[in-house]
Amino acid sequence: MQVLVTLWCLICTCLVLPVAAKKRTLTASSLVTCMENSQLSANSFDVSFSPDDRSLHYDLDMTTQIDSYIYAYVDVYAYGFKIITENFDVCSMGWKQFCPVHPGNIQIDSIEYIAQKYVKMIPGIAYQVPDIDAYVRLNIYNNVSENLACIQVFFSNGKTVSQIGVKWVTAVIAGIGLLTSAVLSTFGNSTAASHISANTMSLFLYFQSVAVVAMQHVDSVPPIAAAWSENLAWSMGLIRITFMQKIFRWYVEATGGSASLYLTATTMSVLTQRGLDYLKNTSVYKRAENVLYGNSNTLIFRGIKRMGYRMKIENTAIVCTGFTFFVLCGYFLAGFIMACKYSIELCIRCGWMRSDRFYQFRKNWRSVLKGSLLRYIYIGFTQLTILSFWEFTERDSAGVIVIACLFIVLSCGLMAWAAYRTIFFASKSVEMYNNPAALLYGDEYVLNKYGFFYTMFNAKHYWWNALLTTYILVKALFVGFAQASGKTQALAIFIIDLAYFVAIIRYKPYLDRPTNIVNIFICTVTLVNSFLFMFFSNLFNQKYAVSAIMGWVFFIMNAAFSLLLLLMILAFTTIILFSKNPDSRFKPAKDDRASFQKHAIPHEGALNKSVANELMALGNVAKDHTENWEYELKSQEGKSEDNLFGVEYDDEKTGTNSENAESSSKETTRPTFSEKVLRSLSIKRNKSKLGSFKRSAPDKITQQEVSPDRASSSPNSKSYPGVSHTRQESEANNGLINAYEDEQFSLMEPSILEDAASSTQMHAMPARDLSLSSVANAQDVTKKANILDPDYL
């Protein structure tokens, strides 16, 4: 916790120090009317106030129909609370330009010095709090108390939480998470890749949900909430590059549209923080309703236009900007994968890398490329659908509309196809194997191409992403098509988020419990954001003070939660980079996907031929044994102790059904630890005997006659790669003993053995040796093979 607090303090210090050094000022660049048929309106408005020298610089271009002396009633509001109320006569302040006022245009560029008593009324915190929510309302009356005009000015202190550093940090960390999951998938670390991929995808969807909820056309978004949402606008592709804006303006005009120039206009005031658009054909308003009016020189942007303007993107270039960055990032992703593939091939050809490195990636790189592009389209699904739907209502130009149609077909079609194929393969797997994970994780083609659609979820809930994409699509429909009604958007999106929140708590579809908890928290924050924007839409007709306070709640909650998610992704990435086995750091998913996944194997040419022959021989030998043959040794021991006539258990096992049932019941018993130790020691001792035997007489081996009773032919003889002799059936039915006697070895016993006693002792052992070291020793086949007997050694 101490580390988190320290890191948070460092981040806040880095963001605040560059701004704190600036001079204290209050500025205003937008003036709007707050009553119908106001006799005073602004063509351009620029005011700045410095409390240090009490100077007020104003540059005004106004139009008025007033012809009289005027009196001003000033109300100053901060976060919806009235903090200053003053009434004054304009003539008494010495402003000769307004004493009296005559009809026509008023153009003033001047400096006035405010009295110290008025400067002291402004609290010092107003110059330090970022994205201050303060405005001044002036009601102008004539000498007979007739209300002539109402104007409203919004102030800013130049400090904001919308920082370039925050945008870069969030984008880079999210990109690192996606890159790490992609690399892990290439190396085959499926468990770690699934976990970090699921959490990174959830992080992306959360960032997009914050940007989407800020795109609602609500009445009044508090400045602090609007500024924080700008930090995550990059997740929707809204990134300004100057030369691109010129290209987009040319393209819109070349394809039959008319490009907007609000950012470069010098006689246009734009208000983006709050307010209602000018409502035509409307003449009746509630007395207490706060209605702002624009005119031909003052525009009020809200919704998607507001976010685009705050990102310094023209309205007619918003859709083009989002589409262009989506395509460019897609080309970069495809080029990166292809460059990696051919770079690896070049390194192998030049001898800089072994031929078995990245074998699975080189073999399936086309399906990996398709799966990566599908995953990328899935990430941009929210961006493409919202911008395309909104373009149908804006109609910037014919060319942009055609591109929007293509992207709608592309995104919706591919996501529908991925959902269909996932459900198809899962249903087929259930039909064939009674388990959806068999084909979804056992088939490499399906996993590489469509794995992005279901690996984040439990195998039982493979279909959840179809529900998630439907949820995103429905939200996109309301955000894109319902920009004319912020209340409709806010209420509909809250209901949709509430339904999905209940569903995710009910089903818990993600691959493990921690991932489910993270995504439930994400859905909780998303639901709270939707709830707050219902208040911002003025759906409940509450006072603006409520919305202003909720704006700070929105900022604090989302900033803290974003920090936690980013630290989680960084922690996962650090653990993976400094771990030799990343899969061991994560708990496996609560399904059997790991049992079906195919792990990376070396290339066929990388395996030595002799080693391959030996492995094949061992495999065929293993087939000669029944299942759990090692564990049957113990059951044979127990059976032989009960046999009074000394008959071998192998012969008696085929006698009656009752004995077969007893042997099958003992197959599941496992040897104890002491028995395993004795067995390993016996094998090591016999190997040492064989080594000493070979060293004592390496050149005295000659051909020897094999006794007829031991050279019985086997009807089930098998051939092995690289071995020319024919195997014989052994008495123990283990395929290991008598096969070596057909290699025509002849042992010269007189020259090897010192005397008859030693020869007799060596050829007539009290127990039969089952190890491979006994190939040079003659054994009595009538003796039982019991290597677990304590007297065996």
From Swiss-Prot:
Which keywords annotate this record? Endoplasmic reticulum, Glycoprotein, Membrane, Phosphoprotein, Signal, Transmembrane, Transmembrane helix, Transport
UniProt topological domain (Cytoplasmic) ranges: 185-194, 245-249, 339-372, 419-461, 506-516, 573-793
List all topological domains (Lumenal): 22-163, 216-223, 273-317, 394-397, 483-484, 538-551
State what this protein does.
May be responsible for the transport of FAD into the endoplasmic reticulum lumen, where it is required for oxidative protein folding.
Chain segments carrying region Disordered: 649-674, 689-731
Where is the protein situated, by its record's location annotation?
Endoplasmic reticulum membrane
Q: Which family does it belong to?
A: Belongs to the transient receptor potential (TRP) ion channel family.
Q: Which residues carry this modification: Phosphothreonine?
A: 626
Main subcellular location of this protein, as a coarse class: endoplasmic reticulum
The signal sequence is 1-21
Its recorded name reads Flavin carrier protein 1
Q: Which GO terms describe its molecular function?
A: FAD transmembrane transporter activity
Matching InterPro entries: TRP_C, TRP_Flc/Pkd2-like, TRP_N
Per the UniProt record, the source organism is Saccharomyces cerevisiae (strain ATCC 204508 / S288c)
Q: Where, by residue number, does the polypeptide cross the bilayer? A: 164-184, 195-215, 224-244, 250-272, 318-338, 373-393, 398-418, 462-482, 485-505, 517-537, 552-572
Residues found modified as Phosphoserine: 610, 771, 774
